[in-house]
UniProtKB/Swiss-Prot annotation:
One of its GO terms (cellular component) is plasma membrane. One of its GO terms (molecular function) is symporter activity. The gene is kup2. This is Probable potassium transport system protein Kup 2. It comes from Novosphingobium aromaticivorans (strain ATCC 700278 / DSM 12444 / CCUG 56034 / CIP 105152 / NBRC 16084 / F199). It comes from the Bacteria. The chain crosses the membrane at residues 15-35, 55-75, 101-121, 142-162, 173-193, 208-228, 252-272, 303-323, 351-371, 381-401, 408-428, 435-455.
Amino acid sequence: MQTITRTSRNSLASLTLGAIGVVYGDIGTSPLYAFREALGQAARDGIVQAEIVGVLSLALWALIIVVTLKYVIFLSRMDNNGEGGVLSLMALAQRATGGGWVAVTLLGATGAALFYGDAIITPALSVLSAAEGLKTIPGLDGMSQTAIIGVTVGILAALFMFQSRGTASVATLFGPVCLVWFVALAGLGLWHIADAPEVLTAFNPLHAVTFLVSHGVTGLFVLGAVFLTVTGAEALIADMGHFGRRPIQLGWLSFVWPALTLNYLGQGALALKALAAAEAIGQPLANADWFFIMAPDVLRAPLVILATLATIIASQAVITGAYSLTHQAISLGLLPRLTIRQTSEHQMGQIYMPGVNWLLLGGVLLLVLGFKSSSAMAAAYGIAVTGTMVVTTCMAFLIAWKYWNWEPVWTALLIAPFLALDLFFFGANILRVSEGGWVPLLVAGLVGLVIFTWLKGRRTALARASEQGVSLNETVMALHARPPTRIEGTAVFLTQDLDVTPSALLHNLKHNKALHRNNIVLKVEIQARPYVAPEQRVVVDRIDESFLKARLRYGYMDTIDVPSDLARADGLLVGPGGTSFFVGRSAIRFAARPVLPRWMTVVYMFLHRNAADPTAYFSIPSNRVVELGSQIEL
């Protein structure tokens, strides 16, 4: 019993350390810029003590309400068979509502689109903020911003180019490095709190309320900047499938939250001390890079190096999250198939998506070169994250109501304060659209357009194919009446509709005048759950002695391997002659009477034409595939 308990504790400690290295990388690097930017918004007419304490109070209570209460305590319980994140919640809400609510799909698509807007900003802002710390090192204070940008571009380019090799070999370092990072955050904070203990009054929420009331519109701009302290909170639920609820909660409550709180208090204490010194000589206090100047000169260079490593790890977590979200979106039918490569033979889920990788790199570098400083870029950050949080909260209401069967009134009373706060933050960030907030909105809009076009185009194409198709039962009856030449072996015809004869089967009969001894009409179905148990994978319905219909069911996080799963199903792939897979490849053409707007058809044609090969996506060896073409007019 003691051995089991000890093993369980070791496993919990290991998972908690892993969560600290992956889940909290984004929110853990916020002290680099969050307090500085929030105070900068408040200090347009000079900094006073009430503004320092007020901004700090807003930051502390944002961590308490948004991260601790909403995400760690409430939303972490809302998982889809252990998986979290906006698309997992969408899939769970679809199951809860029977899949018939279009609003659920729209919410999920909106959340996913906003995530990509956030994904290009996080690496750019965090790495650039760390690189700007170089100017605080004695002797490097004259370093130009152009040189800082060059260093940032070099680090980011190297990071994205490294992705194709996978991160399994270095991932074990993420936890220890971030552990040191959070210890440094806490240590620096404690050191400065002792110089101005009155900073602890910021725990009184009246300071936050008074600040907002007294500063009017300026208070809303400050609130938008304060939100930078909680960016990255979505990762707490998005990574539940990797680490589990308890390690994530334990890591936050016992380590990360205290470290962040102490560091923000330390930055506030340093600002109060600097304010007292400035007032003593009759000078106004200018805003500063409070995080880096917390460290003494001799430790400034090591702190910059540590901050750079922490931001690289945070960026890696966002990149990996983008791969994972894209994989889920493809499985759930929101995006066309993209090339996916496994980067580890031993660890599931270690994937690399070259298309996503290079698009992210292009966006990240454009941001760095366009905004040129972390302060300018910070205005663009919050709007995508707040939008995602609004979507998540709305999804939480649907799940609590429809899936947990809570009373709608009580559910609304619980969710309403969280939604009100999310909308308040969202409104505060909307004010900064002209300062750069338009960038993530533009990215989200483009991704949303792709998702909407793919959903609409694919649904329309499937409907047209069904209209033009022939009933499978009628085809089987016709083959009984006029039997073609039989050849040994098994033919597997992939289809989207089991009631319609696959076009590949019709073309095979037309051109080859032959039919295999055994024929399987197969549909691959993606369930609204992350995983499907192997024993529930295959569902078979026999039509006659030579034809059967089969469903292969996968979760949206499962790795699809059609040949292996068919081979494991008793009695499917039998007899001599081997197995051939017939895939219909449809070409989209303009119809004489179009059913979609022309621009949408053009975009859908582009997406359809550039989608990854379905045989690779289904793990079917190319030497066992026969492709037969058809045309669909839209």
